[in-house]
């Protein structure tokens, strides 16, 4: 390990990640300059907005996989659980509003997780087989429910829900000009300075019109960290996956 790597490893996490992000944007800037017209949108504000929006399903699936792995359960049925959550979330948002839709969607995904738990832990089914079965059945269940319910409404079909109300969005004040405040990132973007303007453009996309649903999903990351590593429940989850017999010896009913 050389001196620069050692110094980097000693930096706190809050300082390392912005440094990695700035280096990543520098790479995008160089690729954009070399590619010219073919890569002109790499650091555009709309690109980073889309990146943030589309990372949410992957983030939620990753958090679900984290809890499963820590509990000692191989969960490859996450895609099917996400599909169930998506359908129930759309149904809930259409009937009761966006925030009820988020809650009902979480319950729908949890139903898929419960099926996986019953099959693997309760009935002893192989984890892989159970996960594959959920991934196969969930799309067909969603398609059937859509054909029976969503097709009865305008805009609905077997592949999409009727139009639902937005959960609303937030533009950060001072950084992106929210609430009529100055717009720091836009000023950086318009400065026309290599790298600095690209950083401003990317950060402007990350801080402009952020859906409240996205903010809730991002908040689940530190919340999950706290639950798994700072609470009694998290300790029990981790010991169940890492050393079940040690958990049994401490009075945790695992088997």
Region locations from a protein language model:
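Single transmembrane alpha-helix segments in multi-pass membrane proteins
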Residues: 46-102, 111-128
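Alpha-helical transmembrane segments of multi-pass integral membrane proteins
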Residues: 49-53, 101-108, 209, 213, ...
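Residue-level recognition of pore/gate-forming positions within transmembrane alpha-helices
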Residues: 82-87, 109-110, 135-139, 221
